[in-house]
Amino acid sequence: MKKILFLIPNLAHGGAERVLVNLANNLDRCKYDVTVQTLFDVGVNRQYLQPHVRYIPGAKKQFRGNTMLMKVFSPERLYRYIVREKYDILVSYLEGPTSRILAGCHDAGVKKAAWIHIELPTPKQAAIGFRTPKEALRLYDTYDRLVAVAASVRQVFTDALPVHTPIDVLYNTNETEKITALAKQEPDDPMFPNGGIRICSVAKLMPTKGYDRLLNAHKRLLDEGLMHSIYIIGIGEEQKPLESQAVKLGVEKSFHMIGFRDNPYQYVSRCDLYVCSSRREGFSTAVTEALIVGTPVVSTDCSGARELLGEHDEYGLIVENSEEGIYQGMKRMLSDPALLAHYKQQAALRGKRFSREQTVQAVERMLDSL
């Protein structure tokens, strides 16, 4: 049995954190002894780890400037301080500090892999968590395998940082059966009333998610008489700025930020449309989940969108990555009920491709090949 360590900054409410929990829970427990370790013991996704997955918590509180502080120390010193046990395979599951930390392991026979979840288009961005792009290139080349969550993520990364380490493309693991079952539960939520056209999006409230653009598109569509309500499921730093923007636009009664929900699927499955307004993505977990529950999708042309929705909009509508693109895509869907019905069928069809079994088996093949 191989001992595997997955190292990640925390298990907060983001997509990468959620799919790590899904993956750790579903790896073959007869083949792998799985440990998940965090740098900081925070995040709602901790509770979803199954009992057979060992969890090693980090510091109790996450503090500002921690990434800069870790750059002061060498990877070797950080590794010796943070990782106290011996493993057969070390996995950094998020680009950044954890990739630098695990690069400090030089033990004979230990294999290393690192995941890249988002587009990192410049050398500086590709070197996030490292002192310099030169250091990042040197340390990434100590890994046995890198993993990108989409082909476009791999291409952007290698353009920015020409590593020699092989890079596999492995899609995120989703609990498809669990998602489908949870989607059938009826939400009892006064913040989510029945009636009218309902549009949703699920994400951390942060600038890269583009909700400021979605708000402006929402206002324009309402002014044209295309009535609908938008529900944003998530929390984050942009909540107050978005609330202020909604009030300024006069749409605070139709643009609802309902916060974090343990079961977002019961909301997404009952919405007429899912919108990904992101400026930048990796391989959107939330869009994947929308497809699994059969909700039509409009997405900006960001990383992973074409792998999810098709090169020619076969399974969803991909639009220009701009406020105008979001507006035009939503307008097209809201103006054409037949098109919306078509993409509802196509979403359910596409969702079947991202089954838990297929994605887990692909990761296991990669681990076994190291």
Predicted regions and their residues:
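Short His-centered aromatic/hydrophobic patch
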Residues: S92-T98, I116
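Nucleotide-activated donor-binding/catalytic signature segment of Leloir-type glycosyltransferases, i.e.
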Residues: E243-G259
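Aromatic "clamp/platform" in nucleotide-sugar-dependent glycosyltransferases that forms part
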Residues: F260, R279
